[in-house]
A protein has these predicted regions:
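Aromatic "clamp/platform" in nucleotide-sugar-dependent glycosyltransferases that forms part
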Residues: 289
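Donor nucleotide-sugar binding/catalytic pocket of nucleotide-sugar-dependent glycosyltransferases
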Residues: 134-182, 187
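A short, well-ordered alpha-helix in the C-terminal region of glycosyltransferases
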Residues: 335, 342, 349-364, 370
Length: 384
C-alpha cells in the first residue's frame, strides 16, 4: 500500500546535528515538512542550513531560551499555527517543553520523542517535572525513543506500552567507517622511515572524547582521570572536541594536573570533518552520566574504535564489557583511570575489539534502516 502524503510539524528545542539528520531524511520523503524551533540558537552546533523542502516557521518561540512563564503565550501561538497549517501530526521533543506545549494545546496526533536526558534525568527532578512528564505522555498518541531505558521510563509515567517504538537514531555507516587498510599500510611505512622516533610512536596512545562540556556528560571526570593516567604513563595523549559551560572548570583540572601540553582541543567540528578525528584516536571515551543510545558512541563504533564508556543503562545496550568495548563505573575517576591503563596494556586487542564494535554498528546503528521505523510510527499516529 502506498503511503499518503502527510503534513508534519517537526518541533524541537534547538537546531543540532541530530535535528538536521531528522529534517534532511524527512525532506527526502513525499511528506510536507514544517520545522518549529523552541529556543534561539545560543551555541551553534550545526553549521548546515535547514534542508531544502523544509519550511521553517516563524512564531512566538525561537527568540530566547525557554522560560516557563512563556508557556501560555507559546501554547496559544501553537494553536494558531495548527489551525493555519492543519498538520496531520506533530513530532515533538524533548518531553517537558516541546511535547508539553503541544499536549497543552490539545493537539491529538502528537508523537512525543524523548531525547534521553528528559526522561532519565529531568523527569524526576521535582514534583512539577513529574506532573509535566506524566501529563505530556498521557496526552501523546505515540512515543518514540532511542533506547529501552527511556521507553521503560515513559511507560512508568503512564505511556501506553503498545503505542511506543524504540529505534536508535543511528548514523551514516558510509561516512563513519574504519581507517582503510591502505592508510594503515602507508602509516606503517612512514613510521619505519622515522627510525629515531619509531619506538616512541609505537607506544603512544591517543584517547578521544567528543562529548559536550556540560555536567551531564562527565567530561570533568575524564579530565581528572587523564591527569592520573598521565602521571603513570608518559605516552598517553587526549583529544577533546566541542565546548560548553564547563570549559573553565575542565581546563583548570588539566592545568592544575600539569597535562595541558598533552591535550589537544579541537573545538567545534562539523559533521564532514568528524571521521578524520575518530581516525586520529586509539580509544574513544564517553564518561556521560545520562544517555539513551549515544550517537557519538555509534560514530566511534562505526569508525572501528574500541570504546570505554560509563556503565549507565543506555551504554550497556551497546557495549558488552570486554567484548566490543569496556565499561567503567559511572562518575568514578579512579575506576576510569584504571580501565584506561588496563586497556592500554592490551593494545594488541584494539583491532579485534574495534572490528566487533563496527559489526555492532552495522547490525544496529544504520540510520537509513532505522529511519523507516519512524515513518511507520507516523502512519500509526495518523490512524490512531
Amino acid at each position: 500500500l502506498e503511503r499518503e502524503t502527510l503534513k508534519i510539524i517537526y518541533f524541537s528545542k534547538n537546531y543540532t546535528p541530530h535535528d538536521y539528520r531528522f529534517l534532511f531524511s524527512l525532506s527526502q520523503t513525499k511528506h510536507e515538512i514544517f520545522f518549529l524551533q523552541l529556543e534561539a540558537t545560543l551555541r551553534q552546533t550545526e553549521d548546515r542550513p535547514v534542508p531544502a523542502n523544509v519550511r521553517q516557521i516563524l512564531w512566538a518561540g525561537g527568540k530566547r531560551e525557554f522560560r516557563w512563564r512563556d508557556v501560555p503565550r507559546l501554547t496559544f501561538d501553537l494553536r494558531r499555527l495548527t489551525k493555519e497549517i492543519k498538520p496531520d501530526l506533530i513530532h515533538a521533543g524533548p518531553i517537558q517543553n516541546c511535547a508539553f506545549i503541544v499536549a497543552l494545546g490539545g493537539f491529538r496526533h502528537l508523537l512525543a520523542m524523548s531525547w534521553g536526558y528528559d526522561l532519565v534525568m529531568e523527569a524526576d527532578k521535582n514534583w512539577w517535572m513529574k506532573r509535566v512528564t506524566r501529563y505530556t505522555l498521557r496526552k501523546s498518541a505515540f512515543f518514540t525513543s532511542d533506547a529501552n531505558v527511556t521507553r521503560e521510563k515513559a511507560i512508568a509515567y503512564g505511556m501506553n506500552p503498545e503505542h511506543t517504538v524504540v529505534f536508535p537514531w543511528g548514523i551514516d555507516l558510509e561516512h563513519f567507517r574504519p581507517k582503510d587498510t591502505e592508510s594503515r599500510k602507508r602509516k606503517a611505512a612512514s613510521s619505519k622511515k622515522k627510525l629515531s622516533v619509531s619506538s616512541k610512536q609505537s607506544k603512544e596512545v591517543t584517547l578521544f572524547c567528543s562529548r559536550t562540556w556540560e555536567s551531564i556528560y562527565g567530561v570533568d571526570v575524564l579530565a581528572k582521570a587523564f591527569v592520573k593516567v598521565a602521571s603513570v604513563n608518559p605516552d598517553v595523549n587526549l583529544i577533546l572536541l566541542g565546548g560548553g559551560s564547563q570549559s573553565a572548570r575542565i581546563r583548570q583540572i588539566l592545568m592544575n594536573g600539569g597535562v595541558m601540553e598533552r591535550v589537544h582541543f579541537g573545538g567545534q567540528v562539523g559533521q564532514g570533518d568528524l571521521p578524520r578525528w575518530y581516525h586520529m584516536a586509539d580509544i574513544y571515551i564517553s564518561p556521560s552520566h545520562v544517555d539513551g543510545s549515544s550517537v557519538t558512541l555509534m560514530e566511534a563504533m562505526a569508525s572501528g574504535l574500541p570504546c570505554l564508556v560509563s556503565d549507565i543503562a543506555g551504554n550497556k545496550e551497546w557495549i558488552e564489557d570486554g567484548v566490543n568495548g569496556w565499561l567503567f563505573r559511572d562518575g568514578d575517576v579512579d575506576d576510569l583511570a584504571e580501565k584506561i591503563l588496563s586497556a592500554i596494556k592490551s593494545k594488541r586487542e584494539f583491532r579485534r575489539i574495534g572490528e566487533l564494535a563496527r559489526k555492532t554498528a552495522e547490525e544496529r546503528a544504520d540510520w537509513r534502516k532505522n529511519f523507516g521505523t519512524l515513518l511507520e510510527a507516523y502512519e500509526k499516529v495518523k490512524s490512531d
